[in-house]
Amino acid sequence: MYELAKKEYGKYGIDTEAAIASLRDIPISIHCWQGDDVTGLDGGESLSGGIQTTGNYPGRARNFEELKADIKKAFSLMPGKKRLNLHASYAVGAEVDRDKYEPKHFAEWVKFAKEIGLQGIDFNPTMFSHKNVKDGLTLSSPDENIRKFWIDHCIACLHIAEYFADEFKSPCLVNIWIPDGFKDVPADRLTPRLRLKDSLDKILACGYDRKKVTVAVESKVFGIGVESYTVGSNEFYQNYAAKNNICCLLDNGHYHPLEYVSDKIPALLAFYDTVALHVTRGVRWDSDHVVLFEDELKEIAKEIVRNNATEKVKIGLDYFDASINRLSAWVTGQGAMQKALLFSLLCNHAELRSLQDMSDFTALMVKQEEYKTLPFGAVWKEYLRRENLSEDYLTEIRKYEKEVLKERN
């Protein structure tokens, strides 16, 4: 089937071998928190910050060893290059608070990531599920002691990220997201943002190595309990990032449902050297459903591929579903992202761009529709074969569920 597909794509000037080779070189940063419903390992408080997991599927990882085992199994069923995306709340054996975290609290993660052949580790300060989230505020808090705690936490995370970069000889992306906002109409929208700006200034002034660490800031339109006002808005962060030469991270669940991250990516590529993504699937709101191979995901992948931005755009996944097998959630979402990238790589973007520039929109529409029915599935299966994987990952996951996950309950 693959040879027939190869010939069919060749009629359109598309090299399937080149597409497969390119796909194998695009790393995806896979989030650890799907495995334990964002619980973390540092004994933090119940989930807060407008974040919610729903469901009670058996087998949730309850400790570091179980989470490692689940990640190892799930990652073994995923094709392509992989990185691990960690939240700071996954510190191992830390007997200090989050503002005092050090590289040693993540040394076991480094050891594990190397053992399973990962390309690197990305990192996130954890500014939720903690007693120092006071009145829903962290880096924008009017309480200077609270604000200093979270500034120190972020600075600690930057130094931990330098450690990751040294260990893997690969830059570490550090994404700063805060839950700060108000449930109802605020009396002052400016001052909290000025406090956030001052906090970020202090964090960036800590002397971290910009060659090793890429700092990103992530906006959100609203969250549960912060429906009326979000301090870290899109406009605030895009201006701050541009002025301070850092990176914007786009989470496609963090915007109005009629806003599309696929349209935002090329807008930022016109000005930024690096754009970061948290790919999720929002259903009516930022519900963080498992990523599926659907239209907007394809459009996101197209903007990465056709703009030659596979090295500029840092792809990470961010979703958590506790209603289904968590390993299946991991593998399905990562596979969907890879499928979307391959689908875009199997497209003659130069031809389509030429039709657009000639204003031949009739031919453009026809060609775009033709691509949808080309034998993509045969190329995907060949890619999996070369990665020594099968399309049927569910059988392996069911076996692991029976032998390992059900024993946890």
What are the residue ranges of the model-derived segments?
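Acidic/histidine-rich catalytic cores of soluble enzymes
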Residues: 185-296
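Surface-exposed amphipathic alpha-helices with a cationic face
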Residues: 75, 162, 200-204
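Short glycine-centered, acidic/aromatic-flanked micro-motifs in structured strand/loop junctions
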Residues: 88, 178-180, 219, 252
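Alpha/beta catalytic barrel-like cores
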Residues: 1-142, 149, 158-160, 166, ...
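Aromatic- and glycine-enriched pocket-lining scaffold segments that form the walls
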Residues: 165-166, 171-185
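A structural/positional concept
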Residues: 153-155
